[in-house]
Regions:
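Anionic-ligand binding patches
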Residues: 2-4, 39-186
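N-terminal beta1-alpha1 ligand-phosphate binding loop
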Residues: 2-21
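Cofactor-binding loop segments of dinucleotide-utilizing enzymes, especially the Rossmann-like FAD-
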Residues: 8, 28, 110
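Surface-exposed, flexible loop/turn segments at secondary-structure boundaries
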Residues: 11, 31-33, 113
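Short loop/helix-cap segments at secondary-structure boundaries that form the rim of catalytic
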Residues: 14-18, 35-36, 57-58
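Short acidic/polar alpha-helix capping motifs at helix-coil junctions
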Residues: 17-19, 33, 97-98, 171
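A short beta-strand-loop structural module common to alpha/beta enzyme folds
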Residues: 24-34
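Compositionally biased, low-structure terminal segments
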Residues: 22-24, 125
């Protein structure tokens, strides 16, 4: 079986490499809208499946892996920020609070589709305006849901507690992928 990763995320590429499965990166183009009435806990899985279904080149003997990560704080989804100002607003919202991170994955073959979601909770200590400005200017988190990467400075300095998989927060629930890929490749 040939594994195809449909993601441009350097973090997802790195994590999948660490699992030891050889893979090839493929591009997909998919509108990332979702129904507004969809429960927050289902959005990441919905988008992951939507991405998988938008890939039309899947052949027999191939496994397509897609993923989507969302951050939810106080019932509001925090996606990727449009600019530095929106990133600062998101980080202020996360400061001193606990939020949820949902990562949905889809593994698709020519005959089977499996979609799973993993949830983690993250508790931030208070983050000052100066720390927010430093983080945004030095680490450029505009490509990350919720405007932060747990593996960055802000994760090391300002996260008080996590519940769930660290790798789910990074954007790829490696434990689920390992289990499912082993099922598909045996």
């Amino acid at each position: 079986m040939k594994l195809l990763l449909a993601s441009q995320s350097p973090r997802r590429k790195e994590l999948l490499q660490c699992l030891g499965f050889p893979f090839e990166v493929v591009s997909i183009h998919c509108d990332e809208s979702y129904p507004s009435q969809l429960p927050i806990c289902e959005v990441a899985a919905y988008l992951s499946l939507k991405k998988a279904n938008s890939y039309t080149h899947l052949r027999s003997g191939e496994i397509l892996l897609t993923a989507d990560t969302i951050v939810s704080c106080s019932g509001q989804i925090l996606g990727k920020p449009r600019d530095k100002q929106e990133a600062a607003q998101m980080l202020k919202k996360l400061s001193g609070n606990t939020h949820e991170v949902y990562t949905g994955i889809t593994l698709k073959t020519s005959t089977k589709t499996t979609t799973l979601t993993d949830k983690a909770e993250v508790e931030f200590m208070p983050i000052s305006s100066e720390e927010i400005d430093f983080y945004i200017n030095e680490f450029k988190p505009l490509d990350k849901a919720g405007s932060y990467g747990i593996q960055d400075w802000i994760g090391m300095a300002k996260i008080n507690k996590i519940s769930g998989s660290y790798y789910t927060i990074m954007g790829l629930p490696t434990h689920l992928i390992y289990k499912e890929l082993n099922k598909l490749t045996k």
